[in-house]
Amino acid sequence: MRWLSAASSAFAVVLWLSGPPFAIGPLVFIALVPLLAIAEVSPSSSWKRPLYAASLAYWLLSLQGLRYAHPLMFLPWIALSGYLAIYPVLFIALLRRLRLVDNCDVSQARRDRVPLCLVAAVVWVGLEWIRNYFFTGISVLMLGHALADMPMLIQIADLGGTYAVSFVIVCVNVAMFDALNRWVVQRTSSVSDSPMKSLVTAGGLLIATMVYGAMSMNAETEPTGKTIALLGDNELTVYEQDIVREQEIFATYGQMAIDAVAKSNTRIDAVVWPESMFSGGLPWMTTGADLVVPDFMQNPAAAPLQPEQLRFAVESKQNDFLDRANSIQRAMRASSTVPTEAPPAIIGGCGLVQYADRPSQYSGVVWVNATGNMSGTYSKNHLVLFGETIPLVHSLPWIRDIVPPGLGLDRGTQPERFDLDGISLMPNLCIETAVERIPVNHMHQLNSRANPKLPDAIVTLTNDVWFHDSAVVDHHLRCAQLVAVGCRRPILSAANGGPTVWIDSAGRVVERLAKGQSDVIYAQPRRDSRISLYVRIGSWPAGLMGAATLCGLAWMTFEWLMRRRKRSVIA
């Protein structure tokens, strides 16, 4: 039991050291070695409990920044960590089932047929694919993210996303385990292959990864000739925020935008405000053709409010919204030291409200063009579980009564593209870059339209101040780096208390604001004309591994049920 606890702890500690805050990336190539050692223990050993406990500690420590968002987030933080801690246990259980059977001849035949490094990589990537989709999905701390600061090794993400990087890492871990087991420990393993077989397989994959990475990083890109100002500050926000505080935040960012233009030696084409910072107590409102006045707007003591009256009121609010935005634009133009005929466009995180057959509210992005008109909006497609949406909150009154206001947002359904003069941008919001499939699917959908046109860059607006400069902010950044490679597009991130950063299409950080720093980044993204294989076909290769893994889990569950039934019959 002590040996199992030590091995489980070693796995958790090494994996934790490979990522933020220490970020010793190369350690990830040996992080799974203790896990593979656990896979060899006898069936009667109690390996699951210590492994789960160590995995739980790893996730609690890695995601501890979540608890700062709200007192109620302690339970979701623990629940999410408890859920994610299951995956290493499932990995070992599947690996043992696939490589160890009662019939030794069959086991040997299996080992001769498929190298362990490939079996382990398929299982691990399959489990990563499952957690990217199950329970709304989360990509944070995939194995491949540990190499985010080693650009040459992550370029294969444009072939298969972070899954491809994780696949290679697992293969190298198995090769290290086989070599250590055979030549250092000097004993025959019940699950591992000949060390030469795994070393050749993993070495070949690693060399191919490096060659492909070197070639990809030298691909030609061209300047867009455009400058995008990314605002970054650390304005404290709370769930139950009053309108006065929202207006204070708006005023602060408004002054930042004006100062950013004044300090620039080049013409600013657009200024990007972080998530929610452009609302200022006044969301952008629209109405639909099938407009129905909501019941909460009706006053029993007065005449019923008619749809035409509501439409007029919304149009009045739209004028107020644009007047406010135009005042910021006029001030930016007046402060500019560079001659310009038009002010910068504004891309801002802002609440969206639509009145149609029912009222809908979204966390969104607005684009006010250089002429002061509303040119486009984006409604967030992926809501934060427990942060923006809670399962059954509308069905169970006792849940609805204890959660703070604002946790009932609606979900957008499609990507958008903002075609500014000379540059096209695809907006993403909040943690959407931390759920890899969201931006990749958006790119795929844009590429699959009747008149396909991909954006020149992805602009992401986020508010990570909730996490108090913890490692969660760094995890978010690493997700964005891998997304940049997977989509082959620069990522321009404007954040409140988070990663305000300019990332190129090779996943390299060109410029980043330090944690706690209030400043602006003048991003001049380069145009990368490549359309990655990952964007073209999506994650179906990893999906096949996920399907195979699900079949394995289903078969293990079936066998467990049969054993229980057999024991109950005997009893």
Curated annotation (Swiss-Prot):
Keywords: Acyltransferase, Cell inner membrane, Cell membrane, Membrane, Transferase, Transmembrane, Transmembrane helix. The chain crosses the membrane at residues 13-33, 51-68, 72-92, 118-138, 152-172, 199-219, 542-562. Coiled coil: none annotated. GO terms for cellular component: plasma membrane. Its EC number is 2.3.1.269. Pathway: Protein modification; lipoprotein biosynthesis (N-acyl transfer). Catalyzes the phospholipid dependent N-acylation of the N-terminal cysteine of apolipoprotein, the last step in lipoprotein maturation. This is Apolipoprotein N-acyltransferase. It comes from Rhodopirellula baltica (strain DSM 10527 / NCIMB 13988 / SH1). The gene is lnt.
